[in-house]
Amino acid sequence: MQLSWKDIPTVAPANDLLDIVLNRTQRKTPTVIRPGFNITRIRAFYMRKVKFTGEGFVEKFDDILKGFPNINDVHPFHRDLMDTLYEKNHFKVSLAAVSRAKTLVEQVERDYTRLLKFGQSLFQCKQLKRAALGRMATIVKKLKDPLVYLEQVRQHLGRMPSIDPNTRTLLICGYPNVGKSSFLRCITKADVEVQPYAFTTKSLYVGHFDYKYLRFQAIDTPGILDRPTDEMNNVEMQSIYAIAHLRSTVMYFMDLSEQCGFSIEAQVKLFHSIKPLFANKSVMVVINKTDIIKPEDLDEERKKLLDTVLEVPGVEIMTTSCHEEDNVMAVRNKACEKLLASRIENKLKSQARITNVLNKIHVAQPQKRDDGIDRTPYIPEAIAKMKKYDPEDPNRRKLAKEIEIENGGAGVYNVNLKDKYLLEDDEWKNDVMPEILDGKNVYDFLDPEIAIKLQALEEEEERLESEGFYESDEEETYEGFDADEISEIREKAEWIRDRQKKMINASRNRKALKNRGTMPRSKLAKTYGDMEKHMSSLGHDMTALQDKQRVAAEKNRYEQTGADVVYGDQEDSAPAGKLRQTDRLTDGVADGSMRSKAERMAKLERRERNRMARAGESDRHATASLPKHLFSGKRGVGKTDFR
């Protein structure tokens, strides 16, 4: 439950709100548009202006509506207090006006955005934008009075004390100038103004103190006059609502010296007038200023008049003097005790908590069967005969705590957690049992009959081996086939395996060539060895061609000269013939036309990179479009050269 409203955002006046939103639109949206631009760009430019302005107003209105409390959702004490201070209907009407303005601004934004979609020129779009912002400004200007009122309410709400209606509370009330604020200053650290005249306190003041490690709040209320509630002003009604709504101990202060300006008869009469507000509350009458006059010093008539307040059930009278701080703490402690006792009594009287606990409890009772047998609870014989534990019995079963004390106490004696294990041999209790062995969970292989099962498996394995279960005769595989058929099957199997290997290799080669440039088949270089292999596979005799190739090779062989003899010792391993150095730029190109075409394409590809000053195809560096040292703070007229 919200108890204070100190975080409500400031409510700007209508003109200031208008300036804030319009300046924000001008700063955060583009400002340059020209008639030569595409019409869709012009429409988008002005639609953005309208939408941004509408969203700015809606955002401000939302902050106002969400910041202020909903007067119907707060505690009745706060609701009546706000009604007294701010006039509930006026408060609701002001918030409703803001909510209505928000709806109208949203509607204007939607309507003019729809119209801007069909704008035909820059001038038309500009006029539509101007009309939209003008209508929004008119709506905001009509909120002049509600916004001023809400700002005043916000300031007052921020100064209101934080009062918790459900905590332990001492409520101080009575006629003006009877010492209420002085008592609050004595028992708390609240800085309350104290003056020797009436109606010094015009609002509720709260102080906090501790009693028996519990937090209490004491509330000083404005003075009340004995008159009908219809004639009471806002200051007095604050006290009435506090007494009516807060669960507290009411401390009614009286001044027997009559220096407050009111007689004892008037003070007693006021007590009986507000007596209906004391229902379900503990009440204490505190007689203040006993340093001037005490109850014993009154005449008999006034004593009898004072005793009439005791006719109310549960009322006690105590005396104190705040000026001399006499009996102040005793009065405070007595009021706290009465409050704590009444709160405990109310808790015991309320059946809600008991009902909530009883709803969670269910006692299961066995239902009678058709045969009529009474099913009594079953108690095992060992449990029934079990002897009750008696600490004085010397033959009693020792508890773990007693064993610990006998062996040195906590920190010296360690409890053996394996002592209660049920095993065949008690010596096994303290054996080290690994949890993980060879990467496997040991508990997965635990079995009381594991040795018997292992022996049965070994016997079955020996029996299968002796029967020849695992033996495999190759002749049985080809049973029903003669030798020629078996040989043919094996040859086919060998051919299939070889064919599968070739297919796998061919697939791998295709994948390897996927990302490489391909040459047309007609342009690929062919060697004599490839032709010989292909023709031989087709069944042609290549002997004559081999002889011709050998003769051609002899003619092309490099003839050794005298220079080769002179410089031959300079190289350890001279080649059999000179190898011609090839040009890698032209190796992959078939003829001159293809070469010129490739050069033109390469030149076009380099042109874009050169224009953008790229180092290569992989250069993706994005340079600053506006270098700060060239553009920061520079103005054309030369007025400013830095920010």
Swiss-Prot record:
GO biological process: ribosome biogenesis
Residues reported to bind GTP: 174-181, 220-224, 288-291
Primary location recorded for the protein, binned into one broad class: nucleus
Keyword Metal-binding: no
Annotated stretches, region: Disordered: 568-643
Gene3D superfamilies found in the cross-reference section: 1.20.120.1190, P-loop containing nucleotide triphosphate hydrolases (3.40.50.300)
Keywords, alphabetical: GTP-binding, Nucleotide-binding, Nucleus, Ribosome biogenesis
Cross-referenced SUPFAM superfamilies: P-loop containing nucleoside triphosphate hydrolases
One of the record's GO cellular component terms: nucleolus
Function: Involved in the biogenesis of the 60S ribosomal subunit.
NCBIfam families tied to this protein: small_GTP
Family per similarity comment: Belongs to the TRAFAC class OBG-HflX-like GTPase superfamily. OBG GTPase family. NOG subfamily.
Name this protein carries in UniProt: Nucleolar GTP-binding protein 1
Organism: Kluyveromyces lactis (strain ATCC 8585 / CBS 2359 / DSM 70799 / NBRC 1267 / NRRL Y-1140 / WM37) (Yeast)
Gene that this sequence comes from: NOG1
